[in-house]
C-alpha cells in the first residue's frame, strides 16, 4: 500500500506540473485526480478512503446521515488530515518551483527576443541590416569598418603634416623678415655713419682750409706791407708760403700750376704796389690786395677740397642742412 501511495503522489505531482505548464490549473487538478484513482486512493467521489472503512467516518457524521444509495462524504482527521495537508503542500511547492523555473526561462527568452540574446551571429546580422538601412551610401566594406580606422589615421596624419608644413613656412617667413629688417637697419646705420663720417671729414677739412686761408692772408698782408721788398721778392715769399701750406694740407700743385700761379701773384703784387702809392690809405689797400692774392692761391691750392664739397652738396645733401660751402673767395 505504501508503494501505491508514493506512486500516486509522484504521478499526481508530475501531472500537476505538466498541467500548470501546458494546460492550466484545472487540467492539473484533473490529472491529479486521475492519478489518485489509478493508485486506489479514492472511492469514486473524489475523496481519499482507506479500504472503504466507514467506521470512523460514521462516528464523525453523527445525525447527518447521507441519503439512501449515496456514500457519506469522506473527511479526514488526526494523522490522516496531517498527511493529506503535507502531501498537498509538497505538491504545491514542487509545482510552484517548476512554474517559477519555466517563467524565468520564458522571461529570458522574451528579453533575448527583444534586445538580442547571446547569438552573436543574429546580433551581427541585425547590426548589418541596421547599418545598411541607415547608411545606404556606404558599401559593405565601409559599413563593416574595415577601412575606417586606416582612413582616419591617414587623414589625421595628413592634417598633422599640413600643420607642420604651415608652421615651418611661417617660421621661415618670420626669420626672413627679421633678417631683412636687420639688414636694412645695418645698411641704414652704415649709410648714416658713412655720410656722417664723410660730412665730418669734409667739414674738418673745410675748417682747416679756412683757417689756413686766414693765416695765409695775414702772412700775405705782412709781406705786402713790407715796402723794402721788391715785387719779385714779395712774389717769391708769397709763393714759398703757399707751396709750404699746400704740402702741409696734403695738396700738391703741378709745375704748370705753380708757374701760372706765380705769374698771377707777380702781376697782382705789381698792381698792389702801384695802387698803394696812389692811394691815401695805403694800409687798407694792402689788406684788400692780400685777400685777393690769398684767394688766387686758394683757388689753385684747394681745388680738390672744393671738388669734394661740390660732390657732397650735389649727391649727399639731405635737404635739411645747408650743405658745405666752397672754400674759394672767403
Curated annotation (Swiss-Prot):
Subunit structure of this chain's protein: The virion is composed of 60 copies each of the F, G, and J proteins, and 12 copies of the H protein. There are 12 spikes which are each composed of 5 G and one H proteins.
Q: Which Pfam families match?
A: Microvir_H (PF04687)
Entry keyword annotation includes S-adenosyl-L-methionine: no
Tell me the segments the record calls region Disordered: 57-79
* Protein location: Virion
UniProt cross-references to Gene3D superfamilies, sorted A to Z: 6.10.250.2700
> What are the GO cellular component annotations?
viral capsid
Listed name of the protein? Minor spike protein
Which keywords belong to this entry? Capsid protein, Viral genome ejection through host cell envelope, Viral penetration into host cytoplasm, Virion, Virus entry into host cell
What residues form the membrane-spanning segments? none
Q: Name the source organism.
A: Escherichia phage alpha3
Q: Which GO terms describe its biological process?
A: symbiont entry into host cell
Task: Provide the function of this protein.
Answer: Minor spike component of the viral shell. Involved in the ejection of the phage DNA in the host and is injected with the DNA in the periplasmic space of the host. Involved in the determination of the phage host-range.
Supply the InterPro entries for this chain. Answer: Microvir_H
Q: Would you say which domain of life the source belongs to?
A: Viruses
